[in-house]
Amino acid sequence: MIVLDKVSKWYGDFQVLTDCTTTVQKGEVVVVCGPSGSGKSTLIKCVNALETFQQGTITVDGTSVGDKDTDLPKLRSRVGMVFQSFELFPHLSILDNLTIAQEKVLGRKQNEAADKAKELLARVGLSAHANKYPLQLSGGQQQRVAIARALAMDPIAMLFDEPTSALDPEMVSEVLDVMTELAREGMTMMCVTHEMGFARKVAGRVIFMDHGEIADDRPTSEFFGNVRSPRADAFLSKILQH
């Protein structure tokens, strides 16, 4: 489904990704963790070409991400992205936030897009807020809208870039509950997060990044057991202290 082979990236002379290689199978949930500045967010942004990379290859369901002939809007519609800062249009209603890309990118008719949006808002528990604006909602509600917006494009995979890091603690669980349900339904997911409880419960595999490298990549049971790299062990011990 998602294949990264020796992906490397530089900002000028500074190398931010070094020979990153991994494969995410269809229906697999992979958590990407690591210290700040380790390249986690950059890595997943490369998957749908929100970041470029200079060496290596990335393919998504057989489509080469770095190929100059690749239709990037089509690729991004097939690989949903949820950011920590929600990225909703503040001047549009919640319903319109979910319909605009369906109409502009997928060519859906207005009523068809609206029906899809209402179905997804019901799915994330926000039907009553369809006519409100983003700033009228809590952070947790806005993030659930962002997830619904990504799902409206019928993606084959979802990328999450620290989706709970900007939320108050009491709002984290409502977002994780939606993500957990997606995983149960078989959505292919790559999720950058420090929510280790979510990783234990939902992820089939954990990738640990450090200094732009994939330093550890193993099944969740092994990562949280006694089989992991010393660098991952040091990181995990700090995370689990709090």
Please provide the spans of the model-predicted regions.
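ABC family nucleotide-binding domain
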Residues: 1-220
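C-terminal boundary and immediately downstream tail of ABC-type ATPase nucleotide-binding domains
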Residues: 221-242
